[in-house]
Amino acid sequence: MRSFYFNKKDERVLFGDIREKETHLLTNGQTIHIEPDEVMDFRSIPYPDESFQAVIFDPPHLLNLSEKSWMRKKYGVLDKETWKDDISQGFSECFRVLKTNGTLIFKWNETSILLKDILELTNHKPLLGHPSGKRMGTHWVLFIK
Protein backbone atom coordinates (compact mmCIF):
# COMPACT_ATOMS: atom_id res chain seq x y z
CA MET A 1 0.00 0.00 0.00
CA ARG A 2 1.06 3.54 -0.56
CA SER A 3 -0.16 4.74 2.84
CA PHE A 4 3.16 6.18 4.04
CA TYR A 5 4.20 7.96 0.85
CA PHE A 6 3.77 11.73 0.82
CA ASN A 7 2.92 11.62 -2.88
CA LYS A 8 0.85 8.52 -3.65
CA LYS A 9 1.67 8.87 -7.36
CA ASP A 10 5.40 9.61 -7.06
CA GLU A 11 7.06 8.29 -10.23
CA ARG A 12 10.23 7.42 -8.30
CA VAL A 13 8.31 4.70 -6.46
CA LEU A 14 7.66 1.21 -7.79
CA PHE A 15 4.97 -0.37 -5.62
CA GLY A 16 4.91 -4.15 -5.85
CA ASP A 17 2.37 -6.42 -4.17
CA ILE A 18 1.34 -10.04 -4.61
CA ARG A 19 -2.28 -8.89 -4.66
CA GLU A 20 -3.73 -7.57 -7.88
CA LYS A 21 -5.81 -4.42 -7.93
CA GLU A 22 -8.36 -4.66 -5.10
CA THR A 23 -10.78 -2.28 -3.43
CA HIS A 24 -12.39 -3.06 -0.08
CA LEU A 25 -15.09 -1.10 1.74
CA LEU A 26 -14.65 -1.53 5.48
CA THR A 27 -17.41 -1.54 8.06
CA ASN A 28 -16.31 1.90 9.29
CA GLY A 29 -16.88 3.33 5.81
CA GLN A 30 -13.17 3.54 4.96
CA THR A 31 -12.14 2.34 1.52
CA ILE A 32 -8.87 0.48 1.02
CA HIS A 33 -7.30 0.56 -2.44
CA ILE A 34 -4.53 -1.89 -3.30
CA GLU A 35 -3.14 -0.85 -6.66
CA PRO A 36 0.38 -2.15 -7.22
CA ASP A 37 2.39 -0.85 -10.14
CA GLU A 38 3.51 -4.43 -10.59
CA VAL A 39 2.14 -7.70 -9.21
CA MET A 40 5.09 -9.52 -7.66
CA ASP A 41 6.02 -11.83 -4.82
CA PHE A 42 8.63 -10.43 -2.41
CA ARG A 43 10.14 -13.92 -2.21
CA SER A 44 11.09 -13.71 -5.89
CA ILE A 45 11.50 -10.11 -7.04
CA PRO A 46 11.63 -9.97 -10.87
CA TYR A 47 14.57 -7.56 -11.13
CA PRO A 48 18.31 -8.07 -11.63
CA ASP A 49 20.82 -7.84 -8.78
CA GLU A 50 21.56 -4.32 -7.55
CA SER A 51 18.63 -2.67 -9.36
CA PHE A 52 17.52 -0.22 -6.67
CA GLN A 53 19.17 2.42 -4.48
CA ALA A 54 16.39 2.13 -1.88
CA VAL A 55 13.93 -0.62 -0.99
CA ILE A 56 11.04 -0.59 1.47
CA PHE A 57 10.14 -4.04 2.78
CA ASP A 58 6.70 -3.94 4.42
CA PRO A 59 5.53 -7.57 4.49
CA PRO A 60 2.38 -8.88 6.15
CA HIS A 61 2.96 -9.14 9.89
CA LEU A 62 -0.19 -10.86 11.14
CA LEU A 63 -1.12 -14.50 11.75
CA ASN A 64 -4.54 -16.06 12.38
CA LEU A 65 -6.88 -13.64 10.64
CA SER A 66 -10.28 -14.64 9.28
CA GLU A 67 -10.99 -14.33 5.56
CA LYS A 68 -13.34 -11.41 6.28
CA SER A 69 -10.98 -9.51 8.59
CA TRP A 70 -10.38 -5.89 7.54
CA MET A 71 -6.79 -6.19 8.75
CA ARG A 72 -6.26 -9.14 6.40
CA LYS A 73 -7.65 -7.09 3.53
CA LYS A 74 -5.45 -4.11 4.35
CA TYR A 75 -2.18 -5.78 5.38
CA GLY A 76 -2.35 -9.36 4.10
CA VAL A 77 -1.59 -12.35 6.32
CA LEU A 78 1.39 -14.60 7.00
CA ASP A 79 1.18 -18.33 6.41
CA LYS A 80 1.35 -20.09 9.79
CA GLU A 81 3.56 -22.86 8.40
CA THR A 82 5.95 -20.94 6.15
CA TRP A 83 6.24 -17.42 7.59
CA LYS A 84 9.85 -17.80 8.74
CA ASP A 85 11.01 -19.01 5.33
CA ASP A 86 8.86 -16.41 3.58
CA ILE A 87 10.29 -13.47 5.53
CA SER A 88 13.83 -14.85 5.25
CA GLN A 89 13.44 -15.15 1.46
CA GLY A 90 11.99 -11.64 1.39
CA PHE A 91 15.02 -10.21 3.14
CA SER A 92 17.34 -12.12 0.79
CA GLU A 93 15.53 -10.80 -2.27
CA CYS A 94 15.43 -7.21 -0.99
CA PHE A 95 19.18 -7.24 -0.34
CA ARG A 96 19.83 -8.92 -3.70
CA VAL A 97 18.08 -6.16 -5.68
CA LEU A 98 19.54 -3.42 -3.47
CA LYS A 99 22.66 -1.64 -4.74
CA THR A 100 25.84 -1.63 -2.66
CA ASN A 101 25.53 1.11 -0.03
CA GLY A 102 21.80 1.18 -0.73
CA THR A 103 19.16 1.66 1.94
CA LEU A 104 16.60 -0.91 3.04
CA ILE A 105 13.76 0.34 5.21
CA PHE A 106 11.94 -2.49 6.96
CA LYS A 107 8.55 -1.95 8.60
CA TRP A 108 7.26 -4.44 11.15
CA ASN A 109 4.44 -4.59 13.68
CA GLU A 110 4.81 -6.84 16.71
CA THR A 111 1.12 -7.79 17.05
CA SER A 112 1.87 -11.46 16.22
CA ILE A 113 5.67 -11.82 16.14
CA LEU A 114 8.38 -9.88 17.98
CA LEU A 115 10.85 -7.83 15.95
CA LYS A 116 13.82 -9.62 17.53
CA ASP A 117 12.50 -12.92 16.14
CA ILE A 118 12.16 -11.40 12.67
CA LEU A 119 15.66 -9.88 12.68
CA GLU A 120 17.06 -13.38 13.30
CA LEU A 121 15.83 -14.31 9.82
CA THR A 122 18.51 -12.24 8.07
CA ASN A 123 22.30 -12.12 8.39
CA HIS A 124 22.24 -8.37 7.74
CA LYS A 125 22.39 -6.18 10.82
CA PRO A 126 20.26 -3.04 11.09
CA LEU A 127 21.85 0.35 11.57
CA LEU A 128 18.96 1.85 13.51
CA GLY A 129 15.30 1.47 14.31
CA HIS A 130 12.41 3.47 15.69
CA PRO A 131 9.22 2.24 17.38
CA SER A 132 6.00 4.09 16.59
CA GLY A 133 2.25 3.67 16.73
CA LYS A 134 -0.29 3.73 19.53
CA ARG A 135 1.45 1.05 21.56
CA MET A 136 4.92 1.55 20.06
CA GLY A 137 4.44 -1.84 18.37
CA THR A 138 5.32 -0.75 14.84
CA HIS A 139 9.03 -0.57 14.10
CA TRP A 140 10.86 1.19 11.28
CA VAL A 141 14.28 -0.40 10.82
CA LEU A 142 17.08 0.92 8.59
CA PHE A 143 19.69 -1.28 6.95
CA ILE A 144 22.60 -0.20 4.73
CA LYS A 145 23.92 -2.82 2.30
Residue ranges and their predicted role:
Residues 1-145:
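Class I S-adenosyl-L-methionine-dependent methyltransferase catalytic core
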